[in-house]
Every structure is written in structure tokens, then in C-alpha cells.
Amino acid sequence: AVTRAVRGRGVLVAEVRYRHRGWNGARADAAKDAETALNDLRERIGSVPVVLLGHSMGGRAALRAAGDPAVRGVVALAPWCPSGEPVEHLGGRRLYLLHDETDRVTSARESWDFVRRARAAGADAVGIPMRIGGHAMLRGADLWHRRAAELTAALLSHG
């Protein structure tokens, strides 16, 4: 959906491949892999505006990596945002966190708390309640895809 939304606009869509399964405590492997991908992108094509999009642990990794100067914003779908997750690095970033309140894997309440804390740190953060989909986003998948694509395209258009 994102690829279609930005087609013909000179946008590269790339995917982070995790080296390890899971977050792995303080190692935060997924976040490190996202940061490595940003550095690899910079080496390949120079400094360009970046929007990070991630689901669940990928949303957490995207939010952690958002301190990179190239990152314009983040779209996080049903992100895993445990209390105490750092937000200080998010000042000046636009963040969209989408979450279905019936999600039983990750907590919408923790996402909304993250949004409040990110705002206090200077981020332009928005929590978007979704009314369908649960964690896997299977029911209403077209809505989730459309919203992710629209928000990603909007973030790329700003600035």
C-alpha cells in the first residue's frame, strides 16, 4: 500500500531485516538493526528524508531509531511501547501511533501514554484509535493499509 501511495514521487521503499528474533532486553536488537539500515541507506544514497513505518516490535524499533537526523517521522501500527520507553530523542519529530483498543498483544493504553510523553519531549505525536483489526490487523486490513500509506505519504510531503 505504501509503495502504491508514493509511486512516481522518487521515493525508495525499503525493508529492515532483523538479524535476531525478538527485542532481547537491553540489547534492543531490532532497534540496532533499524539504525544500521538507516546508516546503510545514507551510505548508499546520501542524506534523504526518511519515514519509518513499523508494526508491533517494528513500531518500537522505528520509534527508537527516530532520533536519527534523517528521520522526518514515524508511523507505528499497534506498537509495543512499554512504560519507560525513551522519548527524549523524539523532539521535533512527527509521530502517528495507530492502535486498536481491543489489541490483546500490545497495549493501546501504553501507546497513548507514549504519545503524551513524546509530546512533553517536543514531538508532534498523535494517537489514532482504530476500531477494528486487533493486533494482527487482519480484520479491516484495507483500512490499516490505507491509513499507513496516507500518513507515510503525508510525512514525506512535509518539510
Pin down the residues of each PLM region.
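Acidic beta-to-alpha connecting loop that harbors the catalytic carboxylate
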Residues: 101-104, 132-134
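Active-site nucleophile loop of the alpha/beta-hydrolase fold
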Residues: 76-83
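C-terminal catalytic histidine-bearing segment of alpha/beta-hydrolase fold enzymes
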Residues: 112, 119-159
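Short beta-strand/loop motif that positions the catalytic acidic residue
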Residues: 91, 96-103
